């Protein structure tokens, strides 16, 4: 006995049914025609997951195994390398899975493997980014500048403890900042220049900013630190915008007070929105990069939020987490054209 199933799309159901039955009768076979309602494919829930880290044997295997364990389908994969740094881009379908939970699980697995991870919706990934905003301390520069000022003032331990508590979100930023600045009262203004001359840019920061500028980005630093240093960074790196808290100075010494409005988390987010509005850039086209609790709101509201060498409180709300060694990996995450990525 021979049985054949055929699925066909027809324009005139009645005419086709009559002709098929006639032809079947001529060759002596039985035919049964049943209307078939095509089931629409489930809409895909696509995300782009970018893995960054030092190249080693087994990275692709380890990550694909993690996707398999989580039941996530990989649509496609691409890989680029720059010296020791490798960037692997996965297009994945999350299906009905919760993106925040998947991101958290993948981040933990990536950290276990010594890798960085950024996960963003495919729709966001495909959207051209036009503004990138960096925090300053421990992001564009390696130091926490207020701690360096405190050492010069002989109050290093006290200020460092307050800084750590503020970074973890244990005390309010304004409260912590005002208390730390109060401890700097009487510090000569010449110390600020001395500190700026010795702080180091984060590895790759200068090259990354240059490539971002050449690729057409507006680049800003918005910091809860001090405007003396953000203004100097703007000049050195050719940034478009720089915002920081202004230290009050009288007779060549710090008064222990801040002039004007304090830039805390909500003020940072407001400034980012103001820059975007001024430049005619939508929030979805904004990238925010920071390391502490004070960066939380601007990272949550940006189209792409990156926790850089950050505390857990920030990693949990960011789209991705990048370690200190991989700042240049942002060029891959942002899909800068190849000619610009080569310069980073």
Swiss-Prot record:
The keyword Protease does not apply. Pathway: Amino-acid biosynthesis; L-serine biosynthesis; L-serine from 3-phospho-D-glycerate: step 3/3. Keywords: Amino-acid biosynthesis, Hydrolase, Magnesium, Metal-binding, Serine biosynthesis. Mg(2+) binds at residues 135, 137, 291. PROSITE patterns: ACT. Its cofactor is Mg(2+). Binds 1 Mg(2+) ion per subunit. Residues 48-120 form the ACT domain. Substrate binds at residues 144, 180, 223-224, 268. One of its GO terms (molecular function) is L-phosphoserine phosphatase activity. NCBIfam families: HAD-SF-IB (TIGR01488), serB (TIGR00338). Belongs to the HAD-like hydrolase superfamily. SerB family. This is Phosphoserine phosphatase.
């Amino acid at each position: 006995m021979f049985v054949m199933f055929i699925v066909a799309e027809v324009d005139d159901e009645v005419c086709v049914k009559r002709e098929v039955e006639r032809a079947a009768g001529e060759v002596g076979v039985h035919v049964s025609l049943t209307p078939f309602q095509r089931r629409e494919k489930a809409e895909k829930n696509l995300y782009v997951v970018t893995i960054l880290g030092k190249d080693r044997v087994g990275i692709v295997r380890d990550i694909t195994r993690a996707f398999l364990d989580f039941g996530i389908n990989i649509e496609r994969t691409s890989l680029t390398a720059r010296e020791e740094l490798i960037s692997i881009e996965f297009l994945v379908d999350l299906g009905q899975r919760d993106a925040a939970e998947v991101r958290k699980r993948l981040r933990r697995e990536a950290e276990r493997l010594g890798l960085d991870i950024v996960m963003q919706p495919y729709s966001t990934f495909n959207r051209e980014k036009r503004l990138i905003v960096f925090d300053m301390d421990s992001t564009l520069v390696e130091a926490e500048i207020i701690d360096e000022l405190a050492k010069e003032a002989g109050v290093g331990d006290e200020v460092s403890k307050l800084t750590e508590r503020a970074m973890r979100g244990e005390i309010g930023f304004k409260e912590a900042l005002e208390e730390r600045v109060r401890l700097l009262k009487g510090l000569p203004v010449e110390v600020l220049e001395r500190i700026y001359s010795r702080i180091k840019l984060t590895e790759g920061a200068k090259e990354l900013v240059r490539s971002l500028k050449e690729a057409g980005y507006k680049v800003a630093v918005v910091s809860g630190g001090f405007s003396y240093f953000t203004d100097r960074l703007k000049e050195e790196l050719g940034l478009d915008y720089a915002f920081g808290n202004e230290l009050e100075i009288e007779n060549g010494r710090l008064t222990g007070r801040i002039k004007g409005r304090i830039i805390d988390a909500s003020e940072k987010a407001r400034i980012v929105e103001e820059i975007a509005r001024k430049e005619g850039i939508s929030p979805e086209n904004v990238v925010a990069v920071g390391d502490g609790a004070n960066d939380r709101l601007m990272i949550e509201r940006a189209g792409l939020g990156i926790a850089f060498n950050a505390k857990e409180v920030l990693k949990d709300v960011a789209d991705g987490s990048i370690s200190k060694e991989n700042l240049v990996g942002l060029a891959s995450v942002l899909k800068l054209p190849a000619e610009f990525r080569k310069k980073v």
